[in-house]
Amino acid sequence: MRTLWMALCVLARLWPGALAGCADAGRCCPGRDPACFASGWRQDRVYGTCFCDQACRLTGDCCFDYARACPARPCIVGEWSPWSGCASQCRPTARVRRRAVQQEPQNGGEPCPALEERAGCLEYATPQGEDCGHAFVPAFITTSAFNKERTRQAASPHWTTSTEDAGYCMEFKTESLTHHCALENRPLTRWMQYLREGYTVCVDCQPPAMNSVSLRCSGDGLDSDGNQTLHWQAIGNPRCQGTWKKVRRVEQCSCPAVHSFIFI
């Protein structure tokens, strides 16, 4: 039987008209389509009605040439667009970036990945250019990885070269947090999963989160004696929030990457 099957395959290559299949019928159909069939040899070596729809891989009744006539093609997407600006000024909100589909998946090819990503952000200037955003009492934080992309002078025209590097690091010991942090699994908010009660975390204060006059970050707890309970909130999911207490101020953060954050 195997010899017969190999002979049929060779015959199909040398004399395509000898065997009907998906190519001869001009059929390649997505999903399950009972009307997408031809007459010829099937891949299970049975002659008769064979199918050229995507579901035939599961049912085992594909035409012998399905893989060649209907190759799987993966979804292809373009590059990410630049990040948008914050949706609004002077309060925690979100920015977004998108990418477009250049080729839809075909014949069971790899499906398209996410076409949109959102990340938390906070604008520190009104449309009129007035300073804002520093009046928030809680400390708004995000992962320190975001600091690599943040443009330090974007929010305020008052920054000078001498104040650009006036940053500092605050160490806190987390006291409590909501269960919503552990539920985050989106690519840009997955860092919230690593927030834990009782751990010491580092939060970097750098422009533009740093006020250009006071050289302080809102919610830094610098005036706390260490016994005061302070509040924090994760940018990107307002339900991920909690409390911590100040440990100390240091010049450079030295916490592990998963416990390193920045003020926003």
From Swiss-Prot:
A single cellular component GO annotation: extracellular region
Keyword Cytoplasm tagged: no
Signal peptide: 1-20
Disulfide-bonded cysteines: C28-C36, C28-C52, C36-C70, C50-C52, C50-C63, C56-C62, C63-C70
Highest taxon of source: Eukaryota
Subcellular location: Secreted, Extracellular space, Extracellular matrix
Record: glycosylation sites: N227
Family: Belongs to the thrombospondin family.
Name of the protein in question: Somatomedin-B and thrombospondin type-1 domain-containing protein
Organism of derivation: Bos taurus (Bovine)
Gene field: SBSPON
